[in-house]
Amino acid sequence: MALKAKKSLSAIFRFAMRNAAKTAEVEAKAVAGDSLISDTGPVSMSLIPDFLSSLKSPEDSSNIGQDFGEPALAGQVSSALDVKSIGYNLLRERNGEKVFPKNVLETLDLLSRKGCSSQKPKQASRGRMLTENYQNKQSEIMEKLAKGCVRKLGTETMFEVLTKMGKEAGEKEYNAMTKLCIQRARRSNDAEYALDQIGKAIEHLKEMRQLGFSIGEGAYGPFFKYLVDMEMVAEFQILKDFIKEACPESCGRLVYYEMLLWIQVNDEEKIHKLCNKVDDSGLSLSILQEYYLVALCEKDSKENFQKLLEIVDITTVSSPDALKSIFGYLGKSLLESVAMKLLWELRDCRKDGVETVSNLIFSYATCIPNSTVEDAIFKFNKLHEELDIVPSSTSYENLVSYLCGSNEVVTALDIVENMCEAGLVISANILHSLLQAIEQILEFNLVQRIYSIMSNKSVKPNSETFRKSINLCIRIKDFEGAYNMLGNLKNFNLAPNSSMYNSIMAGYFREKKVNSALKVLKEMKEADVKPDSVTFSYLINYCGEEATIAKYYKEMKQAGVEVNKHVYMSLVKAYASCGQFEKAKQVLMDLEVPAKDHNELKSVLISALASNGNITEALSIYEEMKKLRCPVEPKAILSLIENSDSNAELGTLVELTHELRDSKFWIDGFFKIIVFAVRNNRSSSILDLLEQTKNHLSKDDVGVEYWFEEVFKSIAETESSDVKVGLDLVSFMKEELELCPSRKCLDFLLHACVNAKDKQSALLVWEEYQCAELPYNVINYLRMYQVLVAAGDSKSAEAIVSKIPNDDKDVKCIIKESRIVFTPKLKKKKKKSKQKGLSLQAK
């Protein structure tokens, strides 16, 4: 921010905070008549945001007119939450006029409750319902929803919405609004906009105090950090005095922020003064020093940190988080001798010293810079040995989580197995970290090691552990292992549930083993496990016959199972797969379908029609939704691209990708177009498309690397392999994206050279392996041998064969067959000429 703007902000800030306790009448008078004198001169109040009175959003109902205020507000809420009603077009703009539906607020219960959007017991989505952190996820969703509303409606309008819906804004809402204002000010390069946001944050703090709310760190913390980063010392002191008066219990945290400030402005005198003196806050010296140490760690003030640490009694530090920060910073600073001295002190003086020290060793070992996972484990074990203690279960749990986060799952499994041998308790959290990491790295076969670990008596799994394990078994088609998991439940006094059986059933359906899937349904009933909506969704989706669809739907209704969104989706997909496109569309006409699910179901209908050959109807529904400004799910757009007619224009497909806001979905859609171009002989346009979008592609994106492999795979699979475009893609990846082609990319391209019998291109690809430092393997040698034989270069072909190990019978067989298949056939021209001569003589 420019110096002048910063000084203006300082003047405004002082004025606002010093008048925080004034009444609304005095504040209004000050706003009407006063002007501010800053270091840069007078600041006109007409140019400053109205900090000290209610701030109206440009889209507030008062700006539209009193008669139309209520529907306008309802429309804004509907738009923000993407709530749609059947028979209405929400927030349409025609000829500049906004049209809003009636009774939108009646259908919108979400913000007036804390968790549920219906008075009936809600059948939650599969993932949320079945996990332990359901409440946390709901909290995250509500926070995300609140942020979306604020972004689209504005802060003040959002508060007004809450009031109109019978929910007063509470501490959480004010905290969120204050934090959002500071975030906006921090991100903005516009001084005037930043001033406006700071003013709103001040107003929120004042309102919280006037309403009697406790002003916690969630509200003032981001504000203080912003002032620290802006090095606004005077403003910091004003805010500090305000918070100290409004919330006396916050004194401990205020000294932490004060230390951050003096470190930021590099005021060594103030830093030393704080480190050596008790202030008037009533806090003990040890507590103050604890906060100061954390601040010094955060700001990387190594010299002052060491000086303070020399006079601090580490055994008086009570906060586990503070100790974690201190020892993490010791590791970061490579101060092992200091760390060992403190660890010995903690080990010898505390009742829980051994466990505390073990946890701190983990913090130290994993924060050492430029160290590998192996280095961290070595240091972890070494320090435990030197201190003559055994790692605690908690430190092991932290270490396993750290390894899983680093994708070192095999190493994490080794450690857990060692824990079993040592008789340490294996908590459900450890198992969940392992299972999540296995799914993340796609090494599903590692779940078999989890199964052997769970046979140990020291393991404490729960139902969710078994559900996740069964799901991973199904991913590798290990149905026997999944059933073994089910049988093992009784050993832990756990009962099977529908989600476990559903995973097995879905696996059988995906493998087209319908009888086995139906057998699972029978086993559920025998185990007294009632089928739920997910069960019936699978049965309907995969039954494949119109009569069976009706049968399962009727059975579900008779069982009293709620028909939720997923069931309607299954009905749409099932009818479409049977070719009953009209019935698929009629599902959406059911009056019981909730209005909030209507657009999502339309998106499913688009996907179902497109994937079952009715691309024309799918596009028609898509265009209709766009005209009505209804959101279309990314998966539906991807399905339209993937199932497009071979004559579709590339420009039309590119326009579809413009609707994909999320970068992951956009990358999927864009590369599906590239694959489409390869498969439909449109290769000439590929490089142009890549050049136009190269700024949106990152070499660090795993999705980009994966999709380039898919493109090369398509090149290898086409009948007339376009090797040249493959070589051009390699050059583009290296030069424009600085991305080295993976082994899969080069393997597919070499295979394309075999199909095209293109020796020169194959030699270029062969060089790329060396550039990428990829060693040649048997498959590479065989492919190159086939190209050389096809080119008639027998000498080079034999040289390649000599490098292939001859102890594999299958490889020998492939070489023999390749020689027969790829050796060029000699044309018998002489024989043809003789036959021609004989025919002439006969004439």
From Swiss-Prot:
Name of the protein in its database record: Pentatricopeptide repeat-containing protein At4g21880, mitochondrial
Alphabetical list of Pfam families matching this protein: PPR (PF01535), PPR_2 (PF13041)
Gene Ontology cellular-component terms listed: mitochondrion
Lineage: superkingdom: Eukaryota
Subcellular location field: Mitochondrion
Family: Belongs to the PPR family. P subfamily.
UniProt keyword annotation of Metal-binding present: no
Entries under InterPro entries matching the protein: Pentatricopeptide_rpt, TPR-like_helical_dom_sf
Phylogenetic placement of the source organism: Eukaryota, Viridiplantae, Streptophyta, Embryophyta, Tracheophyta
Chief localisation class: mitochondrion
PPR repeat coordinates: 392-426, 427-461, 462-496, 497-531, 532-562, 564-594, 598-632
Keywords, alphabetical: Mitochondrion, Repeat, Transit peptide
